[in-house]
Swiss-Prot record:
Pathway: tRNA modification; N(7)-methylguanine-tRNA biosynthesis. Signal peptide: none annotated. The gene is trmB. One of its GO terms (molecular function) is tRNA (guanine(46)-N7)-methyltransferase activity. Keywords: Methyltransferase, S-adenosyl-L-methionine, Transferase, tRNA processing. This is tRNA (guanine-N(7)-)-methyltransferase. The active site is at residue 123. GO terms for cellular component: tRNA methyltransferase complex. It catalyses: guanosine(46) in tRNA + S-adenosyl-L-methionine = N(7)-methylguanosine(46) in tRNA + S-adenosyl-L-homocysteine. Catalyzes the formation of N(7)-methylguanine at position 46 (m7G46) in tRNA. Its EC number is 2.1.1.33. S-adenosyl-L-methionine binds at residues 48, 73, 100, 123. The keyword Membrane does not apply. Belongs to the class I-like SAM-binding methyltransferase superfamily. TrmB family. It comes from Leptospira borgpetersenii serovar Hardjo-bovis (strain JB197).
Length: 217
């Protein structure tokens, strides 16, 4: 990424689309730390990448009040809906970053901040010429290494088998992650079902769940 392009992207990423107490603001000058995410410090922190309509994080935040949830989402309509749900439930443990996480991720947060990171159903870019646009690659895995502590967990879901297989190979080759139990599974009960996931299940799609644990920094 050229310096000019990086500056342009940061000028976008450091802005906020509208006024809300639930926004966090990214900055190239300083990384976000646990002390300046919320009005209080939580026991653990959870990051959802591409949080969509917020239904997964909202459901988890209601059950895990001692965890701070940070959501990264770029689409304004989804962000507005999420904020309405946060307000409806009077949640003090959910904040949103209106940032494209494919631009900046490890640059935004301090190291070892999140005990868990979730990525549900990113675009699989099925055509070979588009594979370079996929989120999960060696650079992304390096960002996970920075943001997770040892024994931190990354959870991933996709309904596209070739993407699941490629993801498994990338984590295997990284040598710093290992599967939590198995390389993939076809059911997941500990994370709420999203609207997109429910739709894919109704269509009869097989969903691959991949959970990786960081074993060394």
């Amino acid at each position: 990424m050229s310096q000019d392009l990086e500056q342009k992207l940061w000028s976008i990423a450091s802005g906020i689309p509208f006024v809300s107490d639930y926004f966090l603001q990214a900055s190239p000058a300083r990384k976000l730390k646990k002390e300046n995410l919320f009005s209080k410090v939580f026991e653990t922190y959870f990051l959802e990448l591409g949080s969509g309509w917020g239904e997964v994080a909202i459901a988890m935040a209601l059950q895990r009040r001692n965890t701070g949830f940070v959501l990264m989402e770029k689409k304004f309509d989804r962000i507005r809906h999420t904020i309405r749900e946060i307000e409806k439930h009077s949640l003090d443990n959910v904040k949103i970053l209106c940032v494209n996480f494919n631009w900046f991720l490890a640059d935004v947060f301090e190291e070892n901040l999140f005990s868990e990171i979730l990525l549900n159903f990113p675009d699989p870019w099925p055509k070979k010429r588009h594979h370079k646009k996929r989120t999960i690659n060696s650079k992304f895995i390096e960002s996970l290494r920075v943001l997770l502590p040892e024994k931190g967990k990354f959870s991933f879901a996709t309904d596209y088998g070739p993407y699941a297989r490629k993801t498994i190979r990338l984590f295997r080759d990284s040598e710093i992650f290992k599967p939590e139990t198995m390389e993939f599974r076809l059911e997941r009960k500990e994370i709420p079902v999203s609207h997109f996931e429910r739709k894919k299940r109704k269509e009869g799609k097989r969903i691959y769940y991949i959970d990786q644990i960081l074993i060394r920094k």
